[in-house]
C-alpha cells in the first residue's frame, strides 16, 4: 500500500475496531482524501513563484518612489542651504561695506571738526590720534594676496574648485564677469592695461619687430594676470571694497612690466605717461614730437589720417635705435619752463597796438603768405586751418601773445576763428559807442553787487497754517498770526542750534491768546509798542508788545491784552496802521471798511462801503504819497482810493472786470508804493498789476507766478517788490525793470495753499514768509 494515501487508509488497515466503518467504504475514503489535498494546495498557493516575483516588483517600485521623493527633498534642501549661504555672504559683505563707510565718515567728520575749529579759533583741536581708518577686510585681502608664489597647477585646481562651488551656489563665470565690470564701472575703474597690451601685441606682429624682451615681459604678465583673475573673482565674492586693492595690484604689475622695457626713451614715456609728470613736462615733450615724425619720414611712409601709429610702433623698438641724449633733453625742458614762466607775465598791449593789429587783420589781401612751420602731432587742430590763418597766427606771436594752437588769440576762449577772425562786435569798435558800453557795464555791476537772500531761520511753533506776519519797526522781532487761534512773538537774536541741520531755530518768547478762531491779519504800530490782530471771530484785538528779552517762562501779564475793537460782524481780513494819524484801518467780510482810533478802545470813527456797492473788501493799505488816502481792493475786481477825512471815494482804478466770472478778477492783496504814487495789486489769475494813483490808469501788468499771487511787499526804499504765491515760490522783482532777480522755494503745499504772507523788515536786513505748512521762514 502507498504510504502517501493518507492517515485514513493507514488506520483502517491496522485498527482493530475499524470494522464498523467499513460499511461506508469508498465515500469516507474519498472525503478524507479531498480535505487533505485542499489544505496542502492552499499552503502551496500562498508562496507561489509568480506571487513572490510580483511582491518583489511591488516593493522595488515603492522603494524607488520613496527614493525619488527623498532625492527631491535633498535637492530642495541643498538649494535652500546654498541660497541661505549666499544670502549670508551678501549680508556679510554689506555689513563690511557699511562698516567701512562708517569709519570713513567718522574720519572725515573728525577732519572737518579739526578744520572748522582751526578756522574759527586758530588753534588745533585735540582729538587724540587721528589715524586713517584701517579695515579688517583690507588686512584679510593683503594676507590673501601674499601666497602668490604657488605653482600654475595649484592655481588651476583652485580655479576649478571655485568654479564648481559657484555652479552649486548658482553663479556662473559670465554673471561674475558682468557684475565685476559693473562694479568697476560704478567705482570709476577701467581696464586700460589689458587693452593697451593687446594693442601693442597687434602692432608688434604687424610691424614684424617682436623682441625677446617683450616676449618675456608678456609671459610674466600672463602668469600674473592668470592669478590676478582668480583673486578678482574671489575678492568680488568676499567684499565689494576689495576691487580697490585689485586695481592697485594691476597697477603694480603694470609698473613691473613697464620696468622690463627701457623707460629712458621719450616715446615710451609718451605711451605710458607717469602721473608724477607735471603739465609743463608734458607740453615740453610735445615740442620734440617733430623728431619722431622726421625719423619716420626717412624710413617709411605713414598714412595721413592716422596720427598715433608712430607711438605704437616705436614702443617695441630698442632704445639704441634713437640715440637720444638725456642731458640735452633735460636742458631743453628747463629752458622751456623758463620761457613759459616768462610768458605768463606778459601784459596786454595798449589801445593803439590793438587798433593797429585790427587794421592789419582786416586787410586780408595785403598779408604776405608765410610758410607754416613744421607740423607736429601735438597740434592736431592746426592742420585743419587754412594757410592764411596760420600765417596770421605767426604774425600775432610777434606781438608777445602766447601761441594758441590755431584758436582765436583775441577771444582767448575755445571758439575757433569765425568771420572777421572771431572779433564780432570788436571789429566795429569806435570811440562813439564807448558811452553805451559804459552804461551797460554799470548796469551789469549793479546786478553783480545785488544782494542774494538766503534762508536763515525756520519758526516751527505753530500748530496750523500761518496767515500773516509783521516785523517790529526797529528790533529784530517778528510777530506771526496763525489759524491755531494764537499769535507768537519771536526774537530773531535768541537762537538755538537746530537738531538736524546747520541752520538755527528760534523759539517764541511770547504767545498772544484771546481770539476765538483763526487769526487772519496782524499789524504793528510805528513805535512797536502795540500790535493789532484780526480774526474770523470779527474782533480786532489790541495788544501791548512785551520786552524782546522777556523770559518765555515768566508769569502771565494781564496788561498785555488791551482789549478788543468791536464793530465788525464777520471775519477781519486786513489791517493797516497810519503812523501820521495813529489810526487803524480794517476791512472785513461784512463788506465794510472801518477807521479806528488806536489810542483808546472805542467804536469805529468812520465806516466805508456800507452799502457794499463795490463788493466785499479783501485788502486795504495806506497811500504812502498821501497819508489822508487809503486804497482798498474788493471781491468784484475793483480797486478804489478813499479819502479818510471826507469819507468819500476819490478814484476807482482801471480794471477789466468780467461780470460772469468772479474768481478770475479776484484781487488778493493791494499795497501802496512807499515813495511813488503807485498801487500794486496781486490777482488770483497769476498777475501783478501796477496803477497810477493820480490817473487810475494801468501802468504795467505781468504774469508773475504759476498759480494765484497771494501776497506782496515792497522794501522800505521802494526798489524791490516781493511776491508770494500758492505755487510755493517767493519771487523778488526789480521795480525799475519789472524783472525777476531771485526766486526761491520756501514752503510746501497744504490743501492747495502754500504762501499766505511776505514782509520786509522796515530797518534791518530781514525778509519773512508765512506758509500754510505752519512754518514761518526768515531770510537774510
Swiss-Prot record:
- One Pfam family this sequence matches: WD40
Name the GO terms of the biological process aspect: negative regulation of cell population proliferation; Wnt signaling pathway
Keyword Ubl conjugation in record: no
Give residues where Phosphoserine occurs.
137, 227, 229, 245, 259
What stretches of residues are WD repeats?
A: 461-500, 514-553, 567-606, 662-701, 704-743, 750-780
Bridged cysteine pairs (disulfide): none
Where in this protein does the record say Phosphothreonine is found? 225
Region annotated Calmodulin-binding sits at 149-166
Which proteins does it associate with, and in what oligomeric form? Answer: Part of the core of STRIPAK complexes composed of PP2A catalytic and scaffolding subunits, the striatins (PP2A regulatory subunits), the striatin-associated proteins MOB4, STRIP1 and STRIP2, PDCD10 and members of the STE20 kinases, such as STK24 and STK26. Interacts with CTTNBP2; this interaction may regulate dendritic spine distribution of STRN. Activation of glutamate receptors weakens the interaction with CTTNBP2.
- Any idea what this protein is called? Striatin
Its encoding gene is what? Strn
Amino acid at each position: 500500500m502507498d504510504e502517501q494515501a493518507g492517515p485514513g487508509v493507514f488506520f483502517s488497515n491496522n485498527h482493530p475496531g475499524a470494522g464498523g466503518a467499513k460499511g461506508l467504504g469508498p465515500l469516507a475514503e474519498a472525503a478524507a482524501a479531498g480535505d487533505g489535498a485542499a489544505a496542502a494546495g492552499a499552503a502551496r498557493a500562498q508562496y507561489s513563484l509568480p506571487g513572490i516575483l510580483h511582491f518583489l516588483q511591488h516593493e522595488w517600485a515603492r522603494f524607488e518612489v520613496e527614493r525619488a521623493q527623498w532625492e527631491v527633498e535633498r535637492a530642495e534642501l541643498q538649494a535652500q542651504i546654498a541660497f541661505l549661504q549666499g544670502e549670508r555672504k551678501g549680508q556679510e559683505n554689506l555689513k563690511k561695506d557699511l562698516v567701512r563707510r562708517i569709519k570713513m565718515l567718522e574720519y572725515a567728520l573728525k577732519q572737518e571738526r579739526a578744520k572748522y575749529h582751526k578756522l574759527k579759533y586758530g588753534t588745533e583741536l585735540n582729538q587724540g590720534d587721528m589715524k586713517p581708518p584701517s579695515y579688517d577686510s583690507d588686512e584679510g585681502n593683503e594676507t590673501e594676496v601674499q601666497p602668490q608664489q604657488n605653482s600654475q597647477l595649484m592655481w588651476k585646481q583652485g580655479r576649478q574648485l571655485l568654479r564648481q562651488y559657484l555652479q552649486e551656489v548658482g553663479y556662473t563665470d559670465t554673471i561674475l564677469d558682468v557684475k565685476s565690470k559693473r562694479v568697476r564701472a560704478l567705482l570709476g575703474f577701467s581696464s586700460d592695461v589689458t587693452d593697451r597690451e593687446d594693442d601693442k601685441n597687434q602692432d608688434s606682429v604687424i610691424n614684424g619687430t617682436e623682441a625677446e624682451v617683450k616676449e618675456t615681459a608678456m609671459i610674466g604678465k600672463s602668469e600674473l594676470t592668470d592669478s590676478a583673475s582668480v583673486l578678482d573673482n574671489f575678492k568680488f565674492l568676499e567684499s565689494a571694497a576689495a576691487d580697490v586693492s585689485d586695481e592697485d595690484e594691476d597697477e603694480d604689475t603694470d609698473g613691473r612690466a613697464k620696468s622690463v622695457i627701457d623707460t629712458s626713451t621719450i616715446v615710451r614715456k609718451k605711451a605710458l605717461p607717469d602721473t608724477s609728470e607735471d603739465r609743463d613736462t608734458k607740453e615740453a615733450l610735445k615740442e620734440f614730437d617733430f623728431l619722431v615724425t622726421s625719423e619716420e619720414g626717412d624710413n617709411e611712409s605713414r598714412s595721413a589720417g592716422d596720427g598715433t601709429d608712430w607711438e605704437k610702433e616705436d614702443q617695441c623698438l630698442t632704445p639704441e635705435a634713437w640715440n637720444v641724449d638725456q642731458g640735452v633733453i633735460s636742458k631743453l625742458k628747463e629752458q622751456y619752463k623758463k620761457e613759459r614762466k616768462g610768458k605768463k607775465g606778459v601784459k596786454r598791449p595798449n589801445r593803439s597796438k590793438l587798433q593797429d593789429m585790427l587794421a592789419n587783420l582786416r586787410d586780408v589781401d595785403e598779408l604776405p603768405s608765410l610758410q607754416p612751420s613744421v607740423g607736429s602731432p601735438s597740434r592736431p587742430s592746426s592742420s585743419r586751418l587754412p594757410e592764411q590763418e596760420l600765417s596770421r597766427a605767426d604774425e600775432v606771436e610777434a606781438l608777445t601773445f602766447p601761441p594758441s594752437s590755431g584758436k582765436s588769440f583775441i577771444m582767448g576762449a575755445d571758439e575757433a576763428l569765425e568771420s572777421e577772425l572771431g572779433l564780432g562786435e570788436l571789429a566795429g569798435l569806435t570811440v562813439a559807442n564807448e558811452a553805451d558800453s559804459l552804461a551797460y557795464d554799470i548796469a551789469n555791476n549793479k546786478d553783480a553787487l545785488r544782494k542774494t537772500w538766503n534762508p536763515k531761520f525756520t519758526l516751527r511753533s505753530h500748530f496750523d497754517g500761518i496767515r500773516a506776519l509783521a516785523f517790529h519797526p526797529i528790533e529784530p522781532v517778528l510777530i506771526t498770526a496763525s489759524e491755531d487761534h494764537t499769535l507768537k512773538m519771536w526774537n530773531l537774536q535768541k537762537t538755538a542750534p537746530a537738531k538736524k541741520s546747520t541752520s538755527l531755530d528760534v523759539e517764541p518768547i511770547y504767545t498772544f491768546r484771546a481770539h476765538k478762531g483763526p487769526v487772519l491779519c496782524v499789524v504793528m504800530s510805528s513805535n512797536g509798542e502795540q500790535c493789532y490782530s484780526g480774526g474770523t471771530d470779527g474782533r480786532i484785538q489790541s495788544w501791548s508788545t512785551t520786552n524782546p528779552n522777556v523770559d518765555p517762562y515768566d508769569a502771565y501779564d494781564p496788561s498785555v491784552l488791551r482789549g478788543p475793537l468791536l464793530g465788525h460782524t464777520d471775519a477781519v481780513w486786513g489791517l493797516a496802521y497810519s503812523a501820521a494819524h495813529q489810526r487803524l484801518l480794517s476791512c472785513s467780510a461784512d463788506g465794510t471798511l472801518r477807521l479806528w482810533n488806536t489810542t483808546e478802545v472805542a467804536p469805529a470813527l468812520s465806516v466805508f462801503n456800507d452799502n457794499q456797492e463795490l463788493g466785499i473788501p479783501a485788502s486795504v493799505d495806506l497811500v504812502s504819497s498821501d497819508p489822508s488816502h487809503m486804497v482798498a481792493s474788493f471781491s468784484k475786481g475793483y480797486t478804489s482810493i478813499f479819502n479818510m477825512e471826507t469819507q468819500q471815494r476819490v478814484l476807482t482804478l482801471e480794471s477789466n472786470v468780467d461780470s460772469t466770472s468772479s474768481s478770475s478778477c479776484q484781487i488778493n492783496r493791494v499795497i501802496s508804493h512807499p515813495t511813488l504814487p503807485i498801487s500794486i495789486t496781486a490777482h488770483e489769475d497769476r498777475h501783478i498789476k501796477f496803477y497810477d494813483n493820480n490817473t487810475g490808469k494801468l501802468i504795467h501788468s505781468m504774469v508773475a507766478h504759476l498759480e494765484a499771487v497771494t501776497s506782496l511787499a515792497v522794501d522800505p526804499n521802494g526798489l524791490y517788490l516781493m511776491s508770494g504765491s500758492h505755487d510755493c515760490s517767493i519771487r523778488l522783482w526789480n521795480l525799475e525793470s519789472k524783472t525777476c532777480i531771485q526766486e526761491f522755494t520756501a514752503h510746501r503745499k497744504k490743501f492747495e495753499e502754500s504762501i499766505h504772507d511776505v514782509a520786509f523788515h522796515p530797518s534791518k536786513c530781514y525778509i519773512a514768509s508765512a506758509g500754510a505748512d505752519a512754518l514761518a521762514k526768515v531770510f537774510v
